[in-house]
Curated annotation (Swiss-Prot):
EC nos: 2.1.1.146
Summary of the function given for this chain in its UniProt record: Phenylpropene O-methyltransferase that catalyzes the methylation of the para-4-hydroxyl of eugenol to methyleugenol. Can also convert chavicol to methylchavicol but with less affinity.
One MF term in the entry's GO annotations: protein dimerization activity
Tissue expression remark: Specifically expressed in the peltate glandular trichomes on the surface of the young basil leaves.
Organism expressing this protein natively: Ocimum basilicum
Binding site for S-adenosyl-L-methionine: 203, 226, 246-247, 260
Gene assigned in the entry: EOMT1
InterPro entries assigned: COMT-like, O_MeTrfase_dom, Plant_O-MeTrfase_dimerisation, SAM-dependent_MTases_sf, WH-like_DNA-bd_sf, WH_DNA-bd_sf
Annotated protein name in UniProt: Eugenol O-methyltransferase
Family from the record: Belongs to the class I-like SAM-binding methyltransferase superfamily. Cation-independent O-methyltransferase family. COMT subfamily.
Higher taxonomy: Eukaryota, Viridiplantae, Streptophyta, Embryophyta, Tracheophyta
Length: 357
């Protein structure tokens, strides 16, 4: 029996719009690489140090651009303006356009307290971009558990453990992310931890989040538990303690257990194990505080849903893990034995979940 042809005839307008859509996604990486270049050239920092908008000529005097490529630099700036990393302003003294920072590029200032530059540099490093080229191979072969393993010959965590420089690179990226989240958490959601005496930050790295919590609320005693090589050499204080351990084996008891961007690194089987360990560690009347993506929450905010889906694909790429919808979170929470939970759309792309045993 002959296959019936499907009519996919398009009007000229539909045809050209379809081409635009394909091309837009085909070259989407150009935005990422232009962003990476802006950071490497230090453009945001140069503008910030200057203290006011700069003309192209002024920027070129501050950056060692090859003279033959000055016109190309103008095109880079045009692309970055289009991506809303810089704005153009008219220069009243002459006709040359001036460039200035946007809220997004303020997050790219290397010395800014809430900089996200280390995270951008990690995500766009070849070690972490190469695995994306193995997606179709990973889907069709059983050999590798993850795309990351297909590209690097080892798991994500093995790579960081075997190459200390990569490990430090990644830890700083996580720290910068924690600084931003901690800033919002202690500023706008301090009530979530009011009345809590003890808190354990599971997988808390070098303690960036915990430090912010004890600084904002000195009466809380925080413990950070992470792998021994992560916390090695970190000094404890009166209200901040570091423990080298394994969250799959044991978690210290506390009034509250914090999981910031932890469960999304794991599939449902491992995620359930972690949540059960956290539930067992919470004292009576306590709770588990989860800061993670809930796919679909805040979807009406510009770019949020797309970011959530990007995160989900990244978790699949690196760990064969995932970001979860609210129904998936709910199942995981109840399967772990929690009786109730509260969801707060608190952090843009991410949400705050309080789970109660």
């Amino acid at each position: 029996m002959a296959l019936q042809k499907v009519d996919i005839s398009l009007s000229t307008e539909q045809l050209l719009q379809a081409q635009v859509h394909v091309w837009n996604h085909m070259y989407a990486f150009a935005n990422s690489m232009s962003l990476k270049c802006a950071i490497q050239l230090g453009i945001p920092d140069i503008l910030h140090k200057h203290g006011r908008p700069m003309t192209l000529s002024q920027l070129l005097q501050s950056i060692p651009i090859n003279k033959e490529k000055t016109q190309c630099f103008q095109r880079l700036m045009r692309a970055l303006v289009n991506s809303n990393f810089f704005i153009e302003e008219n220069n009243s003294n002459n006709q040359e356009v001036c460039y200035w920072l946007t809220p997004a590029s303020c997050l790219l200032l290397k010395e800014a307290p809430l900089t996200v530059t280390p995270l951008v540099q990690v995500v766009l490093d070849p070690t972490f971009t190469n695995p994306w080229h193995h997606m179709s191979e990973w889907f069709t072969h059983e050999k590798h558990a993850t795309q990351f393993e297909a590209a690097n010959g080892c798991t994500f965590w093995e790579k960081l453990a075997n190459e200390p420089s990569k490990g430090r690179f990644f830890d700083e990226a996580m720290s910068c992310d924690s600084r931003l989240i901690a800033h919002v958490f202690t500023k706008d959601y301090k009530h979530v931890i009011e009345g809590i005496r003890t808190l354990v930050d599971v997988g808390g790295g070098n303690g960036t989040m915990a430090k912010a919590i004890v600084e904002a609320m000195p009466t809380i005693k925080c413990t950070v538990i992470d792998l021994p090589h992560v916390v090695a050499g970190l000094e404890s204080t009166d209200n901040l303690n570091y423990i080298g351990g394994d969250m799959f084996q044991s978690i210290p008891s506390a009034d509250a257990i914090l999981l910031k961007s932890i469960i999304h690194d794991w599939d449902d089987v491992e995620g359930l194990k972690i949540l059960k360990k956290c539930k067992d560690a919470v004292v009576m009347g306590g709770k588990v505080i989860i800061i993670d993506v809930v796919v679909g929450v805040n979807h009406d905010i510009d770019e949020v849903l797309e970011d959530q889906l990007h995160f989900d694909m990244a978790m699949m790429c690196y760990f064969n893990a995932k970001e979860r919808t609210m129904s998936e979170w709910e199942k995981l929470i109840y399967d772990a034995g929690f009786k109730s939970y509260k969801l707060t759309p608190a952090f843009g792309v991410r949400s705050l979940i309080e789970a109660y045993p």
